[in-house]
């Protein structure tokens, strides 16, 4: 490989990348101005499309992007539409970090709603901190105690596989949760635990 061929290869990759982003931008434009209002009854919002294109520009330019927008502009769809299409077209992962679990769960619902509209089937993972999940060993110890024996229904739900605090209905009282949740997982601390994988 010659020295000059490195630059040609980089130029070819840049052209291919630009072509992918252009193709995604065409889909984004068609979605927000044609499909969303006509096929799905969603309101066309100029600020939403502007934000979607700004996100594509950030992806194309490989830079960080922060946006502040008022309530009702459609921020979730504005970043999910281009990023879901980007993931479909490139196969590359997309990470969206939020400040609250409630917003993460809203985004999960929005992705379920958008996926058939965009003809995408992304692999989506909702990541929360470990304290939001049951520690089987601590739960077993608690349910064996006199205090824990009064929570037979809760124990049964855990045995059936419910592990996420927000999935329990009715909600688990804080004083009970702090006795059954994962406090701090580490290989060393959990060494020998029959539930650790």
Question: Can you annotate each of these PLM segments?
Answer:
Residues 2-39, 90-197:
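A substrate-engagement module of RecA-like helicase motors
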Residues 42-46, 67-74, 98, 102:
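Alpha-helix capping and helix-loop boundary segments enriched in small/acidic/polar residues
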Residues 61-81:
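Walker A/P-loop
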């Amino acid at each position: 490989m010659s020295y000059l061929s490195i630059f040609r290869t980089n130029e070819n990759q840049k052209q291919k990348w630009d072509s992918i982003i252009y193709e995604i931008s065409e889909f984004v434009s068609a979605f927000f101005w044609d499909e969303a209002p006509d096929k799905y009854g969603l309101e066309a919002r100029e600020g939403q499309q502007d934000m979607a294109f700004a996100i594509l520009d950030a992806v194309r330019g490989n830079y960080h992007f922060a946006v502040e927008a008022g309530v009702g502009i459609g921020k979730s769809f504005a970043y999910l539409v281009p990023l879901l299409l980007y993931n479909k077209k490139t196969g590359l992962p997309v990470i969206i970090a939020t400040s609250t679990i409630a917003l993460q769960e809203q985004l999960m619902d929005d992705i379920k709603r958008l996926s058939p509209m965009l003809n995408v089937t992304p692999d989506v993972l909702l990541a929360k901190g470990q304290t939001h999940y049951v520690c089987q060993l601590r739960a077993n110890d608690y349910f064996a105690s006199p205090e824990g024996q009064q929570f037979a229904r809760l124990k049964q739900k855990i045995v059936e596989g419910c592990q996420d605090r927000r999935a329990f209905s009715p909600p688990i009282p804080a004083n009970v949760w702090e006795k059954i949740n994962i406090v701090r997982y580490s290989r060393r601390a959990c060494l020998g635990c029959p539930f650790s994988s």
